[in-house]
Amino acid sequence: MTKYRAKPLYYCHQAQKFIESKQVKQLSKLEQKSLTYFASRHEFDVYKVLFETSLRSKIELQPKVEIIPPKVTICYPNGKYWKADFMTRIDSKPTMLIEAKGVITKDFMLILSLLELNNQELFNKLWLIFPNSIPQNLLIKRLQQTTMKEKVLTLKQFRKKILTMTTR
């Protein structure tokens, strides 16, 4: 599943610059290994906020999250997994599950439902980060009526909250 109308990009930490997908093929295999893939610019911006804090060494990119456990359904006997954007861990325990969203798609609504149903602990650690404004749909309104209301944020709000959390 890809981002809704997003343009993927690669970031070279060493050169501190973006590299377009078509340029990556021209690089050597060694140079390609030093790149970090981001499905959208917004995803990179969220990563950058995390990277600039004390959470830097605790960030896991594209963690595989179980949304249907194995051997529970006929359709998914091996289970079903979703690759979130980021997870932070302390002592190997997940502390934050972060998804950079531009648009809430029907696929994502289904993923959220399955996560809530089958992995409540991780669902409660979920943060949804939007670029400039938080969409006003039924799903978001419901989330904002729960304890998740403080974890459905714009990028600017997220930056402020993370800096406050990590400088205590």
Question: What are the language-model segments listed below?
Answer:
Residues 1-168:
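Electrostatic, structured charged patches in enzyme active sites and in nucleic-acid/phosphate-binding
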